[in-house]
Amino acid sequence: MFDVNRIRKDFPILEEKIYGKPLVYLDNGATTQRPLRVVEKMTEYYLRYNSNVHRGVHYLSNKCTDANEQARETVREFINAESTDEVIFTRGTTESINLVAYTFGEAFIREGDEIIVTEMEHHANIVPWQMLCERKKAVLKVVPFNDKGELDMEVFRGLLNERVRLVCVAYVSNVLGTVNPVKEMIDAAHALGAYALVDGAQAIQHIPVDVRALDCDFFAFSGHKVYGPTGVGVLYGKRSLLEQMPPWQGGGEMIKEVRFEKTTYNELPFKFEAGTPDFIGVVGLGEALEYVKSIGLQEIAEYEHGLMDYAMRQVREVPGIILYGDAANKSSVISFGIEGIHPFDLGTLLDKMGIAIRTGQLCAEPVMQHY
């Protein structure tokens, strides 16, 4: 049975009072809170086992290395990747997407090629592609969405042609909560010989993800959106593509042999993990995913869906409320405005009541401009 009161006790911050009021935390789209077991696991490694990974033969180094590689296996299982070689640790979704833009972009994008994004993307899935298009003289195409917050799939299909090399789409919109038809878009891209990247930052914590069933070429997400620490994220990539992509950053760990005449690079996934990683953050991410598994992601999804439906019904009854996004397939995010009230004023007022919400452009200005 899904016991929300028991789950709340796993998060000590929810016992806090803000201006004398019980904390109501509704800003999970920006960052989730951490359950106590994640904090305790990271603290254990800082206090008892702290040592660099993949660089020593002593007990502490081996202990941390084993924990990091176990976390990689946890991620692999969580998203159903074929191999841990396809799981690359990064600083977050933004770095994961930039890694693809610089490495896949270097190897696969040529002048005149086209990259497709959607109007509802987070800035992190727009700006790297704009920069790549500037470097390579490629062309960025945009799929619009309607006022319900659903992608115009007819326009998407019309944009597909032999020049398209990459389709980049959010699994779930961070503003609208729309669950996009990513499988359909991936299949359509592949039918023309193009590749597909999925921004999974707002999906990984809400709905089961199976990268092999999706058949996506790349999948990116952040630890701090799924009850893990900040500063750690994941890039999944198909091995066949990762092997063809050049390293992004140079330094320790990503090398096999260094000579002044020539350097050879490490095997996957380490080719893309230059320098000392946030190895204790990785341990925290692994523990966060184990926490989610202990509850059950399907159970979480079902509970959240009921909660969202209830909240949407209640919000519609409030005079002056303007809802943004009412897609038929929607998950976990409700965005709204109130007539005659500036978002920052509303956010400040709610803060005084102990309620934390996100206000502003939500790192998705094109979405805000749509409305």
Protein language model features and the residues they cover:
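Pyridoxal 5′-phosphate
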Residues: 1-371
